């Protein structure tokens, strides 16, 4: 019986690159496909004896120079999607498999909440910054990697959804905190399964669809409404700085915390400033950026800022007050082939329309779930 890939120490990529060969060139020399070389280098499966011999002959080395049995531990190689924090020792990471690619995200890059609450899939033990590849020692069964559904977006309710999904399939849903524009870009690059977006088009008064067309082009996607929510100013209890309009954020005594460029919250603030003809340079803290609604609320609760744009639910969770500015639609954007074929997505979509989940979402405050699960047509 051939040993499983997780039992193999794989040095194929290292040897190929040492001979300055592309995957296609090595595949031609060994008489196999480029896709097979890619899969072997990612350690997705162990090579048959005949294939190992052909590769060794093509690279002019011994089979044991390419493949050997591990002494223990399950090592996998993948693409690094964000920066590894400085410091010594292994780095906690989430590992997912999307369309055959192994994608590695250090937990610190998923936001404070995910970093503290999510269990790591593995530990990054070796990296090559020149090619953005890392080796990860897995802390769980690699068979679970392809079952994960990665949702990029900024809705804190995705963490609640992941807990509901966990009842049906453990560790199935991976929320990755990122702004709407970043989520669409990640979806286009094939780095996530679902993008959560809330982007207003001022000229048409519509939500999300024009941005989807501009960002995704002809990519065939299904758009599913998650909820309508309220977005506005998160403020301290009692609103001591009397922040009620965007003009109040320009007061000399007020400090804001901002969201990153490309997020729906940042777009709302900039639209409000432009409408009131206020320069962003007048706002203390305009350049102080965080990457989620919950981080905005956390900064305000800690006294590091007086206000910031966020959703009512984030204010409620943090025990803060809220000044509404507008009602928005939050949509889930899903490539059609994922929508039709991935079992994990069916679990997610069934979960969000279930009565217990909707009741709890309503209890958070600021969500209107009456259209949850509704499919919205993308413009052609």
Language model: regions and residue ranges:
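N-terminal hydrophobic or amphipathic helices and topogenic motifs
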Residues: 2-7, 14, 22-25, 33-35, ...
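Short loop->beta-strand "edge-of-pocket" segments that line small-molecule binding or catalytic clefts
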Residues: 144-154, 247-266
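Ligand-binding cleft/hinge of the Venus flytrap
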Residues: 160-169, 247, 261, 265-285
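Short helices/loops that flank or line small-molecule/ion binding pockets
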Residues: 163, 181-195, 199-200, 289-304, ...
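Short beta-strand-to-loop elements that line the ligand-binding cleft
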Residues: 172-179, 280-292
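A ligand-binding cleft/hinge motif common to bilobed small-molecule-binding domains
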Residues: 196-213, 297-326
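Periplasmic-binding protein-like
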Residues: 217-230, 320-350, 369-378
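Flexible hinge/capping segments at coil-to-helix
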Residues: 226, 235-256
């Amino acid at each position: 019986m051939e040993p499983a890939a997780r039992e193999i120490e794989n040095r194929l990529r290292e040897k190929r690159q040492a001979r300055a060969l592309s995957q296609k060139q090595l595949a031609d020399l060994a008489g196999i496909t480029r896709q097979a070389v890619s899969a072997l280098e990612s350690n997705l499966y162990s090579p048959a004896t005949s294939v190992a011999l052909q590769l060794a002959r093509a690279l002019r080395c011994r089979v044991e120079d390419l493949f050997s049995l591990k002494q223990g531990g399950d090592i996998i190689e993948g693409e690094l999607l964000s920066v590894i924090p400085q410091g010594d020792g292994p780095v906690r990471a989430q590992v997912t498999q999307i369309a055959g690619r192994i994608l590695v995200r250090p937990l610190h890059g998923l936001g404070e909440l995910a970093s503290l609450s999510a269990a790591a899939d593995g530990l990054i033990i070796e990296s090559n910054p020149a090619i953005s590849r890392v080796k990860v020692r897995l802390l769980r069964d690699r068979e679970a990697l392809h079952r994960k559904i990665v949702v990029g977006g900024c809705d804190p309710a995705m963490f609640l959804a992941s807990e509901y999904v966990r009842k049906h399939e453990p560790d199935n849903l991976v929320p990755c905190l990122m702004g709407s524009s970043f989520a669409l870009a990640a979806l286009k690059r094939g780095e996530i399964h679902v993008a959560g977006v809330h982007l207003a088009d001022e000229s048409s008064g519509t939500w999300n669809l024009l941005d989807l067309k501009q960002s995704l082009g002809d990519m065939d996607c299904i758009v599913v409404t998650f909820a309508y929510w309220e977005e506005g100013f998160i403020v301290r209890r009692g609103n001591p700085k009397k922040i009620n309009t965007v003009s109040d954020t320009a007061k000399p005594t007020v400090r804001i915390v901002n969201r990153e460029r490309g997020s729906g919250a940042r777009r709302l603030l900039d639209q409000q400033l432009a409408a009131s003809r206020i320069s962003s340079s007048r706002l203390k803290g305009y350049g102080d950026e965080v990457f989620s609604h919950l981080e905005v609320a956390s900064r305000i609760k800690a006294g590091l800022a007086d206000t910031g744009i966020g959703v009512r639910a984030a204010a409620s969770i943090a025990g803060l007050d809220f000044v509404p500015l507008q009602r928005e639609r939050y949509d889930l954007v899903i490539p059609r082939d994922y929508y039709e074929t991935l079992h994990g997505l069916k679990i997610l979509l069934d979960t969000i329309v279930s009565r217990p989940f909707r009741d709890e979402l309503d209890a958070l405050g600021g969500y209107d779930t009456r259209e949850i699960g509704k499919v919205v047509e993308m413009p052609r």
